[in-house]
Amino acid sequence: MPTKNDGAAVWELIHQIDNLDLNSSYSYLLWCDMFSETSIVVEEEGEVVGFISGFIHPNKPNTLFIWQVAVEAAQRGKGLGTHMLLQLLNRKRIAQVQYIEATVAPSNLPSQYLFLGLAKKLDTECVVGNYYTSVDFPRTGHEDEQLYKIGPIRRANNK
């Protein structure tokens, strides 16, 4: 689980990834500190190479919403994103989760493949629909965001 000590390194990781929105360094401190049970950080040789920020949806307690998935360039294509998501699903805090949701821009093919592949691996559905449009964002230049909803997630103890 991440700790507040990971916040700065997570910010640096996100800063390196062009297609992710870079939030304030303070926000990553909060994610790593206050949302550590629903987020994950992966280190290799002392460096942060992967991070997922997530939270239990306040209006849907059976849904884990994934805010960002970040994988360092040298680690891409190795299944690290899927591995991190599966590790999150194994946590006690997330035992009640039956669905994963995330918003993905149409140009973000790696995230599309990640969530579609996760649904296939979990042998469940992935429903994609419109969610935020470009006019919902301030100023110009932000793409639409589609909602990916994966589930229901069947666990070994409730099959």
From Swiss-Prot:
EC number: 2.3.1.178
GO BP: any one term: ectoine biosynthetic process
Pathway(s) annotated for this protein in UniProt: Amine and polyamine biosynthesis; ectoine biosynthesis; L-ectoine from L-aspartate 4-semialdehyde: step 2/3
Keyword Acyltransferase: yes
N-acetyltransferase domain sequence ranges: 1-138
Keyword Ribonucleoprotein: no
Xref: Pfam families: Acetyltransf_1
Keywords for the protein's UniProt record, in alphabetical order: Acyltransferase, Transferase
CDD domains: NAT_SF
Molecular function terms from GO: diaminobutyrate acetyltransferase activity
Top-rank taxon: Bacteria
Protein name per UniProt: L-2,4-diaminobutyric acid acetyltransferase
